[in-house]
Amino acid sequence: FELYFAISGIGAICHTINPRLSSEQLTYVVNHANDSIIFLDLTFIPIIEAQIAKFPKTTRYVLMADREHMPQCNIPGVMCYEDLINKQDEDYIWPEFDENTASGLCYTSGTTGNPKGVLYSHRSTVLHSLLSCIYNSGSFAPSRKILPIVPLFHANAWGLPYAAPISG
């Protein structure tokens, strides 16, 4: 989940993508969102390889792996996640921005046409996550375990990537 914090923390937008979208919908979503970097699990390499020519705005692909576990693939310029973070300065100065700045982006399933984008601000993300922590809502606590059943690309994962750490 560190990407949730890192991406929105630098002022970028964390766009989680539904890998079950059709080829056409996936192309639409990636291009409509202007995704410049795609982080992907190794299991999604075939999906990206089949679509990569249709993503002209995407300039970087990062596999969630270390150098030792990097597979051969046909994704130009692909890099491994561990190499990316190891190149960064540990003394990063976090930017400041308005709480209404965009933080997350999810798309609907597109049952009535192209998927629709839903943009979440930092403020809405915090409020959504805090609401999940309320006793009669999610009733999260340090002594509890959370098994998310909602996909990360659905409704910003119901705030779970942020609510769980808030709860300890």
Stretch-by-stretch model annotation:
Residues 15, 118, 145:
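Rossmann-like NAD(H)/NADP(H) cofactor-binding core
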